[in-house]
Amino acid sequence: MNAWEVNFDGLVGLTHHYAGLSFGNEASTRHRFQSSNPRLAAKQGLLKMKNLADAGFPQAVIPPHERPFIPVLRQLGFSGSDEHVLEKVARQAPHWLSSVSSASPMWVANAATIAPSADTLDGKVHLTVANLNNKFHRSLEAPVTESLLKAIFDDEEKFSVHSALPQVALLGDEGAANHNRLGGHYGEPGMQLFVYGREEGNDTRPSRYPARQTREASEAVARLNQVNPQQVIFAQQNPDVIDQGVFHNDVIAVSNRQVLFCHQQAFARQSQLLASLRARVNGFMAIEVPATHVSVSDAVSTYLFNSQLLSRDDGSMMLVLPQECREHAGVWGYLNELLAADNPISELKVFDLRESMANGGGPACLRLRVVLTEEERRAVNPAVMMNDTLFNALNDWVDRYYRDRLTAADLADPQLLREGREALDVLSQLLNLGSVYPFQREGGGNG
């Protein structure tokens, strides 16, 4: 059956700031306390969406979450009106304010793990929300992510959205950032590659930085998504590269159809994994980048592998990269050699995503890949699909509500909270989502 990959990109939120919340993510740590530009960040992301949509790649948008997220501050013991809660936490425990104001939901590669209908036992598209258990600021995302996905994929005959796994370290799940799908045409059954960093009873794990994904979580997600057991491979990421800042697999590998583009040191027991993929995926091609050409450090600093590998109708592929790759002589030299070599990659497309990159999120972090048949695509909430009208409406919306400069100190401003709620109220109507945010269901949450 014919099917297409639709990229659902996260829209950067109004409180995008640099707080260094993500230990193990070196860009996040390096840019801590710098001032950010939320308006520019949102526009950089929108421009990528629109460019790819104009180039013929189906594209949609996932909206930001409510931030600062007052209900969690109340759970932490701060009371009074919303304004009083903000004032108290800013004075007594400002680190909590930064955590509950994070715009990290923009990296929707971590929102969920997807199983296309061609891979599932019941013939539905399955989406399992990620619990993002390893980082407090990200663990807050799952309930609203679930509401948003149910509002976008609202046809229960075709889509099944599963709640996140229990919030315990044993079941740490980071979503599609640790998941690849390999195969022929999108509509054909594919091989799902789940990548984990640690498993109970296995001493092979990183020592410097945390392994965020567990094998136990990956296995549970595969079960929830009803993936045909014959179409699943579980593989461990190389713990040494996690310790060098590769906190998700999509920082060291990206797949599309029959191609796996990865670093030579991406996986533990890499040669066995590639042999298994060759045996199970028709026409499988591994493009392994040697450490002598690109070091792991350079891969992390440029986000070479946090790229999007997109298929054109003629079978050729385009690699979507952050500007940092073009600015690194060694990486750019390698990429031009890659273009000249015998493989499907025939074009490089570069985007300026500096605002997201400074927090450790490149092109692949910003998108959730969902393979859909034509019938399934028609069943998606049409208001989220990118086109000229939506692009212009979202740009105007960003101009109206977003600040062009934000520091951690600004997060205590009650006006920022009010601006954010008003903006999301308007956005949820624009995207026909209904009342997906807690403040909409609780009448503002004051008290």
Curated annotation (Swiss-Prot):
It catalyses: N(2)-succinyl-L-arginine + 2 H2O + 2 H(+) = N(2)-succinyl-L-ornithine + 2 NH4(+) + CO2. Pfam families: AstB. Homodimer. This is N-succinylarginine dihydrolase. Gene3D superfamilies: Succinylarginine dihydrolase (3.75.10.20). Its EC number is 3.5.3.23. PANTHER family: N-SUCCINYLARGININE DIHYDROLASE. Keywords: Arginine metabolism, Hydrolase. Belongs to the succinylarginine dihydrolase family. It comes from Escherichia coli O7:K1 (strain IAI39 / ExPEC). Substrate binds at residues 19-28, 110, 137-138, 212, 250, 359. SUPFAM superfamilies: Pentein. Catalyzes the hydrolysis of N(2)-succinylarginine into N(2)-succinylornithine, ammonia and CO(2). One of its GO terms (molecular function) is N-succinylarginine dihydrolase activity. InterPro entries: AstB_sf, SuccinylArg_d-Hdrlase_AstB. Pathway: Amino-acid degradation; L-arginine degradation via AST pathway; L-glutamate and succinate from L-arginine: step 2/5. Transmembrane segments: none annotated. One of its GO terms (biological process) is arginine catabolic process to succinate. The active site is at residues 174, 248, 365. It comes from the Bacteria.
